[in-house]
């Protein structure tokens, strides 16, 4: 994978070791320290993966901790869900409205899981 103005580089990359030449395969995306970089430096696949991971953790929390108080839920949400979504966000900071809405939906669904504030509007649930 190459970064630059012209990503249509035709040269092959290789690694030489003990007089042996190993060709390196070209990739469309790479996972580095948990952040998925693609050849266009768009983080759509990374955001999709993190949002899906957050939903699966929310499902796990919902199945195992049905009648949880507000403070306990906030603690579990921040440690298990939000940490996944916000990891390295200074690198992949979402700038497209579509990506921001995907991430916001995770929090919206999480606030609906708390029985004591479930019936409030989303804005009021965030103020709690």
Where are these predicted regions, by residue range?
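Structured alpha-helical bundle/scaffold domains in large eukaryotic membrane-trafficking regulators
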Residues: 73, 93-96, 119-126
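Short intrinsically disordered coil segments
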Residues: 14-19, 47-52, 127-128
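Charged boundary/loop elements
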Residues: 86-100, 104, 111
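Charged/polar positions on well-ordered alpha helices
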Residues: 6, 56, 90, 109-112
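Short, conserved micro-motifs composed of acidic
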Residues: 1-28
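Short, charged alpha-helical motifs in flexible N/C-terminal segments and linkers
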Residues: 1, 101-128
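Basic, alpha-helical interaction scaffolds
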Residues: 23-91
């Amino acid at each position: 994978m190459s970064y630059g103005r012209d990503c249509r580089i035709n040269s092959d990359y290789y690694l030489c070791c003990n007089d042996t030449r190993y060709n390196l395969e070209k990739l469309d995306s790479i996972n580095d320290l948990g952040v998925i970089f693609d050849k266009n430096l768009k983080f759509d696949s990374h955001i999709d993966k993190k949002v899906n991971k957050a939903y699966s953790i929310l499902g796990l929390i919902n199945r195992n901790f049905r009648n949880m108080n507000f403070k306990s839920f906030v603690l579990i949400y921040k440690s298990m869900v939000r940490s996944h979504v916000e990891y390295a966000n200074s690198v992949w900071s979402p700038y497209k409205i579509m990506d921001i809405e995907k991430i916001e939906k995770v929090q919206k669904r999480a606030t609906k899981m708390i029985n004591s504030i479930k019936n409030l509007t989303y804005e009021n649930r965030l103020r709690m």
